[in-house]
Amino acid sequence: AWPAIYAALGSVYVNGFPVIEGLLNAVHLDHLIELEVSEDELLKHTGERIELTSWADDYFESASGRVVTIHVTHTAQDGTLLANETERFAIRGRAYSDALPPEAPDYGGIEAEIESTPRRLLRRVKVVAPHEMTAFARTSGDFNPIHTSHRGAAVSGLAAPLVHGMWLSATAQYAVQALDEKGAHYEIAGWTYNMYGMVQLDDEVEISIERVGRVAHAGMVLEVTSRIDEILAADQGA
């Protein structure tokens, strides 16, 4: 989806000039996705071409920079709406307000009655981040040079490229959905991913999956936390 996301991001103008001057200026704040079909229905479209439609809301000023919200719909060839996606970016160096950006909707924005439960650890795994990000860039379409180029990373004051934030999101989702030794797994209907830190190449990341609530009449509410020495990302799934 990333070519469509970046195209929408580049469509936002301020006083006749693009709001983004380059990908190195864009800080990815959060990622939301809500499935509109079941996992079984989604798998029926494996191998098909998926049509993406993207657009941007008007920017708003915040203490984090100018915040731009991008929306993407994922539609199958037969017209079935598969998923709604939302991405938010802050444009660095353009902070004209002391207001904090509003928090992203929980659980991918799904509308459901949710009840809190005692917190319970369901899974904990450790993964090692890739040694370099070219393969993920080719798969996702996200060729932001801060992730794929040592020179691009150096322009941002970094010693080496950073791991894609969306690599960690995908890895956390896989940890939730993977089969355990008993053949059990969890199906994700909505997902909110908030990023709080950077993952370096070859970092070892601990991913903890906890139940924190339940959806009325069906399903659980999960909180997924990724950390090295501190919390790097917090995910909410339902």
Predicted regions located by residue number:
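Hot-dog-fold acyl-thioester-processing enzymes
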Residues: 1-30, 96, 100, 105-107, ...
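Catalytic-pocket segment enriched in acidic/His residues
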Residues: 153-206, 210-221, 226-231
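HotDog/MaoC-like acyl-thioester-processing domains
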Residues: 29-124, 199-238
